[in-house]
């Protein structure tokens, strides 16, 4: 009967039924028959139409087995489905709904043994399912979500599973473990990215319920166990897959257990099982945040935050962290930090942004601020942690926090009091100490409070928001971030409407000078302002927190606090009016923030007076042939000094406005003792950290206040002013170490006299009293009747101001220490690099920044008045606008630089006039980068010849020139003198063209004599294209002409090889060389010797056009690539210079060195190939010219280009056969020219004569010296003048 029934069944049903084993009793784990299962899988994989029928039959079989309670058959059914998924995963959508139906049937049985068997099948299903199927089939989506909800309900701790039997603790733990394993498969599935919102909304709360423990907030042990369990899983995956027929023995099962739990009690085993469940929940949460889907991370973070807010974790640990510096935190903060570490580095900022959005979007209800407190404490912890939030928009987060602070301050109609109840000492927070000795008094009243009030909650939330703003400085990702943060807060501080009405007449007096708010305030709405006293206090305390955190903590980006740019002084622009705020708390908070800036953001370099940077002309950039990125970098770099000038102008305006406000505060009749002490503390700290930069403004103001002493209305006002003035003068004596001088004795005697007469404030002392000790409640009550009336006898004026300023100047000048010069890693703010020239003078050079500028000294001695101060501020404002946006100012700076350079030529120490530059130029003008020396190396005169070409460094050089180049260092170490320096060859290759020099490839030497420079400057106007700079050798001849003659000793000059009598220059000479009038000038040439005239150290030959005129010509550089027609000029010069000579004379033979002396060409090549003779040159000139093109020439002396150009422009008789007219070469007779200082002009083309026997012999002897190894001066091809392929 059974066989008949089987024969009527379809084949797929028969194959399925054969997989179930017959005998299942006594077997712990039932598995399908392996051979029958293999055939079933083959049958289903080869016939896709049978997959749906197989799934439908397994549904019926599972329903019947679950109803009958046959656990073994249920296990076989689930294993058949798992094997089918592994065999045909591509066709999973055909039978996916059948799998979900089978799983749902088993889960509804509420039998833990059956439900546990569904986990392996569900894991495979989640691993292989397709997300496209989920989006296409709506019924499938609903069925899958119901299955996810069922598994999540098993893992929930709040809604236990309803079973037929009572639930025990171990059984509940088993249900939770099953649910968590299924959730782990859900969060690792690809389908989560498609339907993540619905699934995460169900899964995340359940995970957090299992992870949350009210008594244990440590997550580090769980993380360690999670890593170990994950490692074990990886090892199991690496093992060979076991056969389904393999039976595990008891020893194998026991070996997988935990020996600790086996040896412990039942309670220990339950505790270990609970720990395993929490570890599993932690791994599930890690899978959610370790993905790269930002939408998923954002949504999951919002769910985590909602769960944490609902749990209301304690905030006591947060208070302890803010007081002690660090602590373990609570469960919520640790969880948030762990989640941030799990997330990808580039996506971690999403967590903080989501946290801020959750905080801002939650409605504010007075008295119900617990959720905001929890979120703010978590944000404070995350910002203060070491988690790198790269990609975070710090400014957006800052603006969002400021807006939330404004909303919080408006809560309760703005009538709430933000001062804490336990005293005023916490309003001014002292700077944290590194030795951790700060008192922790924030917990004194925490135990006594029964229930927090609305005011206390607002105040606590406000403190947390201030800490959040300050901790933003931990994450510094660009140089000016801290400055931008402070400026963003400062520009939102606005006076209250009442204060604006009181000071309306003051604003009319200084309409443009005194601005109580930044001009950029118009960009913001009125709601963004901090106009109340509480808002201003909060903003100023936030500024202080930013400064403290930025300096005491290392940035999470991996850089030290020194890596960022310092906060400049001009960020405080527009805040001086806060010294006149009606509320003393606001005045204290402002002084506290400003003192924090002075202590943390100033360095020793701020004690020096900043030098103004000048811009050089950009006209030379038109001929700049450097690449575009280099020019762009140079353009950006060159604007930095002008930005520094603008910042210096802003800082000067702020200091003047600050001192003007101090004058107004002291002059008011309502000024109290605490106000005087606060101003005294501010002034002393200003001079302590800014030096003369602050004293230049303070001294005139205090002298003006001193003049008002006899006319003071009340005796208390005279007491305040007198104590403030002389207390500050005593601080100057202490700062500049003036003890023992006459002004110091006068100041100390006056203070002693006033103390004896009882007209001195005892609280004016050095060091000044701390700010938290200056409070209105501690002011001393002064009786007017007990004070004598102010007169000239009691309050003696300080009259030694000039002597005091002179002593300050002396101390300033003597305290200068020249800093060592070292190459910087990147172009900083100082782009004007002094040239590495040598100073051979006996007097040491004093840098420009070492002396106190004259205008600073005059400013300290000048009388002060309100009108003059406002006029000076207006001038500074006009100068700032001109420097920042006007092209006229740029031209003026360039013209001024050219004028200074020309004055350096005409009035230098080595000039014929003998006049030195003025003292004002030496002190006030920055040292030019073209000739500023770096040291006195006058003792090294005997130097070797240098093989490195000289370069001029311009102030607007590119970023590559911002560091000291290796070539420049070698030039300094070799102590090169300009008299014997070989200059770069124009044919060697192109060097980088500088922005202020037209070409470094000029054929005219740049080592000009002083008389040449002076004459040229006087004879012709300065061209806009010729940006003259001082030559490198200018500051080397301070010793005068005698020293100059002493440098040209022949024994120190290396030998130079002789030249062939015939020379062929490929391509000819450029046609744009300057051919000005040639006149003679007194030359500082050394005595004649047997050395060739083409030697590099030899001065230029004197040219004689007329015997009666003596002058020199300053030849300008011309680029070799310029093209210019000379037909007209050559014709005019031919008619004007008629002579009786037809070519090069050959009357006197003065050797080879005289042959090319008139032309001025020096060949420094070690020639290995001899030029052909004259008779063979006609047919081999083309090949010989190409061979000669590989030779390296160096034009180290001036050249008479008229003579060469006329000869080259003449028609050539030796035309090539192809008719190209190529110049084959120039043959020059070996006979010299009579006299070494005369030059014969040619009126016609030169005649090239043939060589006789005597000349041929001389030629052969001379050319034999040019072969390699023939002379000891032969150099390698890598040296200058060596043989080698040209760089072009």
Swiss-Prot record:
SUPFAM superfamilies: ARM repeat. GO terms for cellular component: plasma membrane. Residues 1124-1139, 1174-1190 have a biased composition (Basic and acidic residues). Residues 500-522, 816-835, 906-964, 980-1155, 1167-1195, 1208-1288 are annotated as: Disordered. Residues 1073-1083 have a biased composition (Low complexity). Residues 511-522, 906-921, 995-1012, 1212-1221 have a biased composition (Polar residues). One of its GO terms (biological process) is protein localization to plasma membrane. Transmembrane segments: none annotated. It comes from the Eukaryota. PANTHER family: PROTEIN EFR3. Belongs to the EFR3 family. This is Protein EFR3. It comes from Coccidioides immitis (strain RS). The gene is EFR3.
């Amino acid at each position: 009967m059974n066989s008949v029934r089987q024969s009527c069944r379809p084949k797929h049903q028969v194959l399925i039924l054969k997989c179930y084993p017959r005998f299942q009793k006594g077997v712990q784990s039932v598995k399908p028959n392996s051979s029958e299962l293999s055939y079933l899988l083959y049958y289903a994989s080869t016939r896709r139409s049978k997959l749906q029928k197989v799934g439908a039959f397994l549904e019926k079989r599972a329903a019947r087995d679950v109803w009958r309670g046959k656990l073994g058959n249920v296990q076989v059914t689930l294993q058949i489905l798992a094997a089918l998924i592994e065999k045909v995963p591509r066709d999973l959508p055909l039978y996916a709904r059948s799998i979900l139906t089978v799983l749902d049937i088993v889960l509804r049985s509420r039998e833990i043994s059956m439900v546990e068997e569904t986990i392996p099948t569900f894991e495979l299903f989640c691993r292989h399912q397709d997300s496209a199927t989920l989006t296409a089939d709506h019924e499938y989506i609903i069925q899958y979500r119901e299955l996810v909800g069922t598994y999540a309900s098993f893992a929930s701790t709040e809604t236990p599973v309803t079973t037929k039997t009572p639930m025990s603790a171990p059984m509940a733990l088993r249900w939770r473990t099953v649910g968590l394993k299924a959730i782990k498969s859900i969060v690792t599935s690809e389908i989560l990215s498609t339907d993540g919102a619905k699934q995460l909304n169900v899964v995340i709360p359940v995970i957090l319920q299992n992870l949350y423990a009210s008594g244990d907030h440590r997550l580090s042990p769980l993380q360690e166990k999670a890593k170990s369990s994950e490692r074990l899983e990886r090892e199991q995956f690496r093992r060979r897959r076991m056969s389904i027929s393999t039976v595990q023995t008891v020893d194998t099962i026991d070996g997988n257990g935990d020996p600790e739990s086996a040896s412990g009690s039942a309670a220990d085993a339950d505790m270990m099982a609970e720990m395993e469940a929490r570890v599993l929940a932690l791994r599930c949460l890690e899978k959610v945040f370790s993905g790269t889907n930002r939408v998923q991370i954002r949504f999951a973070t919002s769910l985590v935050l909602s769960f944490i807010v609902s749990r209301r974790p304690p905030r006591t640990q947060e208070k302890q962290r803010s007081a002690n510096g660090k602590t373990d935190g609570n469960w919520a903060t640790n969880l948030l930090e762990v989640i941030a570490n799990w997330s990808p580095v580039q996506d971690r900022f999403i967590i903080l942004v989501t946290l801020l959005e959750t905080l801002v979007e939650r409605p504010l209800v007075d008295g119900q601020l617990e959720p905001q407190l929890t979120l703010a404490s978590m944000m404070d912890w995350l910002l203060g942690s070491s988690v790198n939030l790269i990609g975070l928009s710090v400014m957006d987060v800052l603006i969002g926090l400021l807006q939330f602070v404004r909303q919080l301050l408006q809560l309760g109609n703005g009538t709430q009091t933000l001062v804490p109840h336990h005293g005023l000492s916490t309003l001014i927070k002292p700077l944290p100490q590194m030795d951790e000795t700060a008192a922790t008094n924030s917990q004194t009243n925490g135990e006594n409070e029964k229930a927090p009030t609305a005011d206390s909650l607002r105040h606590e939330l406000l403190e947390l928001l201030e800490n959040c703003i300050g901790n933003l400085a931990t994450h510094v990702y660009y140089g000016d971030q801290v400055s931008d943060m402070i400026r963003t807060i400062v520009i939102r501080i606005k006076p209250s409407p009442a204060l604006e009405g009181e000071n309306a007449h003051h604003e009319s007096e200084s309409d443009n000078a005194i601005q109580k708010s930044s001009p950029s305030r118009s960009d913001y709405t009125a709601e963004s302002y901090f106009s109340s006293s509480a808002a201003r206090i909060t903003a100023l305390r936030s500024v202080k927190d930013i400064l403290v955190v930025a300096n005491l903590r290392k940035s999470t980006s991996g850089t030290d606090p020194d890596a960022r740019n310092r906060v400049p002084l001009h960020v405080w622009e527009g805040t001086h009016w806060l010294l006149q705020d009606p509320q003393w708390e606001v005045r204290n908070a402002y002084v506290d923030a400003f003192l924090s800036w002075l202590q943390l953001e100033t360095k020793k370099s701020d004690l020096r007076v900043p030098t103004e940077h000048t811009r050089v002309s950009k006209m030379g950039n038109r001929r700049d042939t450097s690449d575009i990125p280099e020019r762009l970098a140079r353009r950006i770099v060159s604007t930095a000094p002008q930005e520094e000038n603008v910042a210096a102008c802003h800082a000067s305006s702020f200091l003047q406005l600050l001192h003007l406000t101090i004058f107004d505060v002291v002059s008011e009749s309502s000024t109290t003792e605490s106000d005087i002490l606060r101003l005294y503390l501010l002034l002393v700290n200003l001079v302590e950290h800014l030096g003369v930069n602050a004293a230049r403004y303070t001294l005139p103001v205090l002298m003006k206040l001193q003049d008002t002493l006899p006319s003071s209305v009340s005796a208390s006002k005279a007491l305040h002013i007198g104590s403030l003035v002389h207390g500050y003068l005593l601080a100057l004596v202490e700062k500049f170490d003036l003890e023992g001088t006459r002004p110091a004795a006068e100041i100390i005697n006056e203070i002693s006299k006033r103390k004896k007469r009882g007209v001195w404030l005892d609280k004016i002392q050095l060091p000044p009293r701390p700010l938290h000790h200056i409070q209105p409640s501690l002011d001393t009550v002064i009786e007017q009747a007990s004070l004598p009336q102010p007169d000239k006898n009691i309050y003696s004026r300080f009259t030694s101001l000039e002597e005091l300023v002179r002593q300050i100047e002396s101390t300033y000048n003597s305290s200068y220490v020249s800093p060592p010069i070292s190459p910087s890693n990147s172009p900083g703010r100082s782009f004007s690099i002094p040239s590495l020239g040598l100073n051979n003078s006996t007097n040491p050079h004093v840098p420009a920044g070492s002396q106190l500028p004259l205008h600073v000294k005059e400013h300290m001695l000048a009388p002060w008045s309100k009108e003059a101060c406002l006029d000076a501020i207006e001038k500074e404002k006009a100068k700032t606008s001109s420097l920042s946006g006007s092209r006229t100012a740029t031209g003026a700076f360039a013209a001024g630089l050219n004028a200074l350079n020309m004055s350096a030529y005409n009035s230098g120490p080595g000039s014929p006039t003998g006049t030195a530059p003025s003292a004002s130029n030496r002190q006030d003008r920055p040292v030019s980068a073209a000739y500023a020396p770096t040291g006195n190396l006058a003792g090294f005169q005997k130097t070797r010849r240098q093989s490195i070409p000289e370069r001029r460094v311009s102030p607007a050089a590119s970023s590559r020139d911002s560091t000291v180049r290796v070539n420049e260092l070698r030039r300094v170490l070799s102590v090169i003198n300009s008299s014997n320096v070989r200059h770069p060859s124009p044919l060697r290759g192109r060097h980088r063209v500088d922005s202020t020099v037209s070409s470094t490839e000029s054929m005219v030497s740049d080592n000009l004599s002083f008389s040449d420079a002076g004459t040229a400057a006087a004879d012709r106007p300065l061209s806009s294209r010729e940006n003259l700079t001082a030559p490198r050798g200018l500051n080397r001849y301070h010793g005068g002409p005698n020293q100059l003659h002493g440098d040209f000793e022949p024994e120190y000059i290396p030998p130079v090889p002789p030249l062939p009598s015939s020379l062929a220059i490929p391509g000819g000479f450029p046609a744009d060389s300057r051919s000005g009038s040639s006149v003679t000038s007194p030359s500082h040439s050394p005595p004649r010797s047997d050395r060739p005239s083409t030697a590099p150290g030899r001065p230029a030959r004197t040219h004689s056009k007329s015997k009666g005129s003596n002058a020199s010509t300053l030849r300008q550089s011309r680029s070799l690539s310029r093209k210019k027609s000379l037909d007209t000029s050559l014709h005019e010069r031919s008619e004007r210079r008629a002579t009786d000579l037809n070519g090069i004379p050959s009357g006197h033979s003065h050797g080879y060195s005289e042959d090319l002396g008139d032309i001025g060409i020096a060949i420094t090549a070690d020639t290995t190939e001899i030029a052909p003779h004259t008779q063979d040159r006609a047919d081999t000139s083309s090949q010989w010219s190409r061979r000669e093109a590989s030779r390296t020439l160096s034009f180290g002396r001036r050249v008479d280009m008229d003579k060469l150009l006329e000869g080259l422009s003449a028609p050539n008789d030796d035309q090539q056969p192809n008719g190209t007219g190529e110049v084959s070469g120039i043959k020059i007779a070996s006979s010299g020219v009579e006299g070494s200082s005369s030059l014969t002009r040619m009126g016609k083309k030169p005649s090239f004569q043939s060589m006789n026997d005597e000349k041929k012999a001389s030629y052969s002897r001379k050319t034999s010296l040019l072969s390699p190894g023939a002379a000891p001066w032969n150099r390698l091809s890598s040296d200058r003048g060596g043989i080698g392929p040209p760089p072009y």
